[in-house]
From Swiss-Prot:
Glycans are attached at T211. The lineage of its organism: Eukaryota, Metazoa, Chordata, Craniata, Vertebrata. APOE is an apolipoprotein, a protein associating with lipid particles, that mainly functions in lipoprotein-mediated lipid transport between organs via the plasma and interstitial fluids. APOE is a core component of plasma lipoproteins and is involved in their production, conversion and clearance. Apolipoproteins are amphipathic molecules that interact both with lipids of the lipoprotein particle core and the aqueous environment of the plasma. The modification Methionine sulfoxide is found at M142. Residues 277-289 are annotated as: Specificity for association with VLDL. GO terms for biological process: AMPA glutamate receptor clustering; amyloid precursor protein metabolic process; artery morphogenesis; cellular response to lipoprotein particle stimulus; cholesterol catabolic process; cholesterol efflux; cholesterol homeostasis; chylomicron remnant clearance. Heparin binds at L161, R162, K163, R164, R228, Q229, K230, L231, H232, G233, R234, L235. It is found in: Secreted; Secreted, Extracellular space; Secreted, Extracellular space, Extracellular matrix; Extracellular vesicle. Belongs to the apolipoprotein A1/A4/E family. Sequence repeats lie at residues 79-100, 101-122, 123-144, 145-166, 167-188, 189-210, 211-232, 233-254. Homotetramer. May interact with ABCA1; functionally associated with ABCA1 in the biogenesis of HDLs. May interact with APP/A4 amyloid-beta peptide; the interaction is extremely stable in vitro but its physiological significance is unclear. May interact with MAPT. May interact with MAP2. In the cerebrospinal fluid, interacts with secreted SORL1. Interacts with PMEL; this allows the loading of PMEL luminal fragment on ILVs to induce fibril nucleation. This is Apolipoprotein E.
């Protein structure tokens, strides 16, 4: 079966070599073909090299299939998705615990914004994981198709697979940037709401302290000032803690962004390397067979061409 599979791939590449060259971009590197001497080899040696190529590719076919069926990328993205959603949930619960006793309206607004961001992030990362699983299933299905279907779909499938991987990586990159901006904006609005709500209370405290100072004297004024400073200190503490959490979630989003972008680059490089490997395996064989066949046809034509008849010599 392996020898038959390799023979099918050789015939496929010989038939759609021109299509593959047109669909691959200029950025994809190709393995340089080893130079050959000017003296052409006999066609028997060319046939021997053909079987040598088949045996060589047969030893590599299992490795190629293992690379195509590898699920390490999907597993790493799954773990990364779970870790990210866990951190978002922990931040949401901590922020609700800090703002709950002070401002229920602010707590409800922040909770709603964080739930929406959490749902969008989880949905998009789950979509990316499902797409990667779909790519793997399509590759497995492609390897099981008949010779005619495989020959018709090979060139376009490789190009579409590469474009989809690049498009999904770029889409996820843009969405993460939107989430980062949304988280920053939501946290800033929450801090502003806290200041707006407690600002009048501080002013009322100052006004009451001034009024009571005229009635009860200096000791009561000092107590009111101490209460105002204590309340102001608590407000500043809440603001600092919320800002720290905002910085932490920004850093986590940047790390997630970097990891996902790295995974996208790795998938793109793997696809390009696999395409280059296929071409480097079979292009030298196809070119060598075409050259040897042309030489054989030329030799046969020369052998079948009638030789000119020499004139008879006269004896004197």
């Amino acid at each position: 079966m392996k020898v038959l599979w390799v023979a099918v791939v050789v015939a496929l590449l010989a038939g759609c070599q021109a299509d593959m060259e047109g669909e691959l971009g200029p950025e994809e590197p190709l393995t340089t073909q080893q130079p050959r001497g000017k003296d052409s080899q006999p066609w028997e040696q060319a046939l021997g090299r053909f079987w040598d190529y088949l045996r060589w590719v047969q030893t590599l076919s299992d490795q190629v299939q293992e690379e195509l069926l590898n699920t390490q990328v999907i597993q790493e993205l799954t773990a990364l998705m779970e870790e990210t959603m866990k951190e978002v949930k922990a931040y949401k619960e901590e922020l609700e615990g800090q703002l709950g006793p002070m401002a229920q309206e602010t707590q409800a607004r922040v909770s709603k914004e964080l739930q929406a961001a959490q749902a969008r992030l989880g949905s998009d990362m789950e979509d990316l994981r499902n797409r990667l699983a779909q790519y793997r299933s399509e590759v497995q299905a492609m390897l099981g198709q008949s010779t005619e279907e495989l020959r018709a779909r090979m060139a376009s499938h490789l190009r579409k697979l590469r474009k989809r991987l690049l498009r999904d990586a770029d889409d996820l990159k843009k969405r993460l940037a939107v989430y980062q901006a949304g988280a920053s904006e939501g946290a800033e609005r929450s801090l502003s709401a806290v200041r707006e709500r407690f600002g009048p209370l501080v002013e009322q405290g100052q006004s009451r302290a001034a009024t009571l100072s005229t009635l009860a004297g200096q000791p009561l004024l000092e107590r009111a000032e101490a209460w105002r400073q204590k309340l102001h200190g608590r407000l500043e503490e809440v603001g600092v803690r919320a800002q720290d959490r905002l910085d932490k979630i920004r850093q986590q989003l940047e790390e997630v962004h970097a990891k996902v972008e790295e995974q996208g680059n790795q998938m793109r490089l793997q696809a390009e390397a696999f395409q280059a490997r296929l071409r480097s395996w079979f292009e030298p064989l196809v070119e060598d067979m075409q050259r040897q066949w042309a030489g054989l046809v030329e030799k046969v034509q020369l052998a079948l061409r009638p030789s000119p008849t020499s004139p008879p010599s006269e004896n004197h």
